[in-house]
């Protein structure tokens, strides 16, 4: 009898404890951080989050928010272009991105996933576009979800070399994978 009470107590306690936070990538949020929120609201929702001012190799400013050892979300704020400026807690977030493999879309697509595996969930690659300035590669799938961008690892696309800029292709390297997934108030590659 005591054995059954112990098991029942453990089950009840388990249900009362909060589940581990899931890092879901949706059209307007990543890991519960929403487009349009400001960083003060994010800090209130995630008091243990670590926020750091960073910049990419091109000098674009962003704030990296570390939610756990497995989850980091990069936020861009409208008009926040100075990587040396202090973090602006009241500016709204207009773009979110993550490189964290623990984060995934509702269909299970995540950073680090092979392009071939993503095709099983999003349809065949319709095209891969290489951006003109940074030479970043983005895949567009036949069932591409609106507002999402899927950035490929560098060198994933196989280009003919004859096209104009930006280069476009449907071919990719066998081991090519998704580097990052982002959502933005400006939308993504919806075509």
Residue ranges and their predicted role:
Residues 5-15:
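Sec-dependent N-terminal signal peptides
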Residues 19-135, 141-144, 159-191:
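Short helix/turn-capping signatures at newly exposed starts of structured segments
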Residues 1-2:
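N-terminal secretory signal peptides that target proteins for export/translocation
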């Amino acid at each position: 009898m005591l054995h059954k009470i112990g098991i029942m107590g453990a089950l009840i306690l388990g249900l009362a404890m909060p589940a581990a936070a899931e890092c879901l990538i949706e059209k307007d949020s990543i890991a519960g951080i929403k487009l349009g929120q400001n960083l003060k609201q994010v800090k209130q929702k995630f008091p243990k989050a670590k926020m750091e001012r960073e910049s990419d190799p091109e000098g674009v400013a962003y704030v990296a928010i570390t939610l756990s050892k497995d989850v980091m979300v990069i936020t861009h704020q409208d008009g926040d272009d100075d990587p040396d400026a202090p973090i602006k807690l009241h500016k709204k977030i207009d773009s979110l991105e993550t490189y964290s493999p623990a984060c995934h879309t509702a269909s299970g697509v995540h950073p680090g996933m092979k392009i071939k595996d993503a095709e099983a969930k999003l349809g065949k690659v319709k095209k891969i576009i290489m951006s003109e300035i940074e030479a970043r590669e983005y895949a567009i799938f036949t069932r591409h979800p609106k507002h999402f961008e899927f950035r490929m690892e560098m060198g994933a696309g196989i280009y003919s070399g004859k096209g104009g800029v930006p280069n476009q292709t449907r071919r990719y390297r066998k081991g090519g994978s998704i580097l990052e997934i982002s959502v933005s108030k400006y939308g993504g590659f919806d075509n």
